[in-house]
């Protein structure tokens, strides 16, 4: 693909950014000894899932995810006696997805997954995120759900924090950048141990469920990041902001790798043309994704 088409592709990505942002993918690892079915499954709808391939509880987890309307799920089924999740994480490393959830996660596995997400984002520039229970990771890639004992119309018994992470992952994957998950109504909840100190918990990087007297809702849409730097300010603690950052990074990288590298001569003129394409992409993102009052620019580093 030549450079004129790259510009067209960037403009198209900009125009469709909001719509594409509502089509997130949830990866879910289920501990299940059911013999039927495969270890790796990709479903576009809960209607694609054969309930006989999973335990009744694991099937409820999938229903929780799909209540949030993700574009699809990547389901990895492992035995209940598995010693660690390293093989599954290696599989997921080569796939494209947005949010990871493991309803049967142990404390040791939580530590491993949190460290893996941090490494994937910080060292390998992946845009993976995970919804984990009671995980003070202090990182933008980890959403720390802390509300427990959640009674939902989607389950036969109350859900633990770890289990209800499935619902949150589905919500986050299905929301577009046109809105935040703050005060998103969770209409399936009929009871939950909501915190009395919600403001303090939110400031501590916790995603909490609140009750306004009539409805249960997500409190404020924050991730676990609480230590801020000049490079990673307080804005990076907002889930919606990070969704925009990740979408931007994926679009630039994917277009560069598929339409520039090996397709054109990497000389100064072509680099400038590619930068011009990025600037056109910026203009399409201003408003819902990029702050139109900010100088959103791109340039070649010649040093």
Predicted regions and their residues:
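Acidic, serine/threonine- and glycine-rich low-complexity intrinsically disordered segments
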Residues: 184-195
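A general structural signal for short secondary-structure junctions and capping/turn motifs
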Residues: 17-19, 90-92, 199
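Extracellular Cys-Trp
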Residues: 58-182
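Short linear motifs in intrinsically disordered/low-complexity regions
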Residues: 33-34, 51, 123-124, 139, ...
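Short, surface-exposed beta-edge/turn micro-motifs
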Residues: 23-25, 96-98, 127-128, 194, ...
């Amino acid at each position: 693909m030549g450079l004129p088409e790259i510009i067209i592709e960037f403009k198209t990505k900009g125009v469709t950014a909001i719509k594409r942002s509502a089509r997130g993918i949830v990866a879910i690892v289920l501990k299940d000894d059911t013999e039927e079915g495969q270890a790796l499954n990709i479903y576009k709808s809960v209607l694609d899932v054969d309930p006989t391939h999973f335990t009744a509880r694991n099937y409820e987890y999938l229903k929780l995810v799909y209540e949030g309307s993700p574009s699809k799920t990547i389901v990895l089924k492992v035995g209940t006696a598995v010693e660690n999740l390293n093989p599954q994480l290696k599989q997921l490393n080569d796939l494209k997805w947005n949010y990871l959830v493991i309803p049967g996660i142990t404390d040791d596995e939580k530590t491993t997954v949190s460290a893996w997400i941090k490494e994937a984002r910080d060292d390998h520039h992946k845009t993976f995120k995970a919804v984990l229970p009671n995980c003070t990771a202090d990182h933008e890639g980890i959403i720390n759900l802390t509300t427990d004992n959640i009674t939902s119309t989607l389950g036969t018994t109350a859900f633990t924090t770890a289990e209800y992470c499935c619902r949150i992952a589905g919500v986050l994957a299905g929301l577009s950048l046109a809105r935040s998950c703050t005060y998103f109504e969770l209409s399936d909840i009929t009871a939950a141990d909501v915190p009395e100190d919600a403001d303090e918990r939110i400031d501590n990087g916790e995603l909490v469920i609140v009750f306004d007297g009539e409805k249960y809702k997500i409190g404020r849409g924050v991730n676990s990041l609480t230590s801020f730097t000049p490079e990673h300010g307080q804005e990076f603690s907002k889930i919606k902001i990070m969704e925009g950052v990740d979408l931007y990074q994926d679009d630039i990288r994917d277009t560069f790798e598929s339409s520039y590298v090996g397709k054109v001569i990497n000389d100064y003129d072509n680099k400038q043309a590619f930068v011009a394409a990025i600037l056109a992409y910026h203009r399409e993102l201003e408003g819902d994704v990029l702050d139109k009052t900010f100088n959103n620019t791109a340039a070649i580093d010649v040093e």
